[in-house]
UniProtKB/Swiss-Prot annotation:
Belongs to the TACO1 family. SUPFAM superfamilies: YebC-like. It comes from the Bacteria. Its main location: cytoplasm. This is Probable transcriptional regulatory protein YebC. GO terms for molecular function: DNA binding. One of its GO terms (biological process) is regulation of DNA-templated transcription. It holds the Pfam family TACO1_YebC_N. HAMAP family: Transcrip_reg_TACO1. Keywords: Cytoplasm, DNA-binding, Transcription, Transcription regulation. InterPro entries: Integrase-like_N (IPR017856), TACO1_YebC-like_2nd/3rd_dom (IPR048300), TACO1_YebC_N (IPR049083), Transcrip_reg_TACO1-like (IPR002876), Transcrip_reg_TACO1-like_dom3 (IPR026564), YebC-like (IPR029072).
């Protein structure tokens, strides 16, 4: 299956994302603590924790930092008194957007999210307004690799689909609870992924042009800058040509 991988669409944002690494680590640690608090400290028995561990390792977090966060969660750290909140809305160009938050204060969080939408030409929607457009999946990504080898190992391990892109990148899709098991099987076969994360995948795409793409990127950046926001998912599709101008 051909197409454009996320590597092409996100490469132009790498420098800005690297500058946010400190904030990213803070958010990952918060998720590790919360997941361990709610489901226990064993990643093999706690899919949410395993997903957080995989994300931490994909972002080059040290095992020591990771293990300390899990221990805090198991020990009942105050940071674990958080709830997961999902907000939905529409962004520039009619993009559908889902925002996953961890918060101990709903009023503060919704005010920050609403402010970002109002600043960037979007609208915060009601529950269910765009959720039906997304499916929760595990995504194991290889920036490059042998398609046949990865596909055979992935499908044998229980993956749902394997997609190869024009630039040589390969994504392995799994049920989100099975992502850790599939990644382990791939590594056992000598196939080390560049990243593994749980994501909300859109069933439809909204094409962004030179006018709407920068507005969408600004909205995503504003949302990601909110301390309570863990993840931002959207169905905006940015071509290589438009991405090169951002």
């Amino acid at each position: 299956m051909a197409g454009h991988s996320k590597w092409a669409n996100t490469r132009h944002r790498k420098a800005a994302q690297d500058a946010k690494r400190g904030k990213i680590f803070t958010k990952i640690i918060r998720e590790l603590v919360t997941a361990a608090k709610l489901g226990g400290g064993d990643p093999d028995a706690n899919p949410r924790l395993r997903a957080a561990v995989d994300k931490a390792l994909s972002n080059n977090m040290t095992r020591d930092t990771l293990n300390r966060a899990i221990a805090r969660g198991v020990g009942g750290d105050d940071d674990a008194n958080m709830e997961t909140i999902i907000y939905e809305g529409y962004g520039p160009g009619g993009t559908a957007i889902m925002i996953e938050c961890l918060s101990d204060n709903r009023n503060r969080t919704v005010a920050e999210v609403r402010h970002a939408f109002s600043k960037c030409g979007g609208n915060l929607g009601t529950d269910g307004s765009v959720a039906y457009l997304f499916s929760k999946k595990g995504v194991i990504s290889f920036e490059k690799g042998d398609e046949d080898t990865i596909m055979e190992a992935a499908l044998e391990a229980g993956a749902e689909d394997v997609v190869t892109y024009d630039d040589g990148a390969i994504d392995v899709y799994t049920a989100w609870e099975e992502m850790g098991k599939v990644r382990d099987a791939l590594e056992a076969a000598g196939l080390k992924a560049d990243s593994a994360e749980v994501s909300m995948l859109p069933s439809t795409k909204a094409d962004m042009d030179a006018e709407t793409a920068p507005k969408l990127m600004r909205l995503i950046d504003m949302l990601e800058d909110c301390d309570d926001v863990q993840e931002v998912y959207h169905n905006g599709e940015i071509s290589d040509e438009v991405a090169a101008t951002l």
